[in-house]
Amino acid sequence: MITSVNLQDVKDKLYLDLKDTGWDDKLKSFLQGTEMDKILEILLKEAMDGKRFTPPVKYIFRALKSCHFNKTRVVIIGQDPYPQIDVADGLAFSCSRQDRTEVSLQYMQKCIMDTVPQEDRAPVQSNDLSRWADQGILLLNTAFTTSIGKPGTHQILWRNMMVNILDALVWNSDPLVYVFLGKKAQ
């Protein structure tokens, strides 16, 4: 059980996780501000009340850590993390479980197979999409967390963080391709 947590320590850790990704400078004021305090307080309260959320804290900003700001070429935005235990891994549509492919990922894979010529596509080798992130595809959800078994519960919580991220991307000098998947993401 969680007994004592210093929010500033958590904020500092999350900020340091983004060091050298280009996101640290773009999001510094948000990450070090009072809004991030509120987000962390809500997540901490849920944890202390015995409620679980996903993905695990160490993966909350994995999408940003995995795709350097200056190397981002495509932004794929989904709704929120898979709401099952041990499925969400911090990258939208990616899945830490290899024994079962989630329906939304199956749909994406089918769309790729149906629209991209075979000679132009790499084979899908796993449910982990970190290779996509390595290639400049930012795999974001509109919410970075959700309660276990309850999709959409943290949408409002992360809204301003997403606004900050999208603002930073829009004002990026390089043109980007945006793909919004799902009604909530659109």
Role assignments for model-derived ranges:
Residues 1-16, 20, 167-170:
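Class I S-adenosyl-L-methionine
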Residues 21-186:
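A polyanion-binding, active-site-adjacent surface
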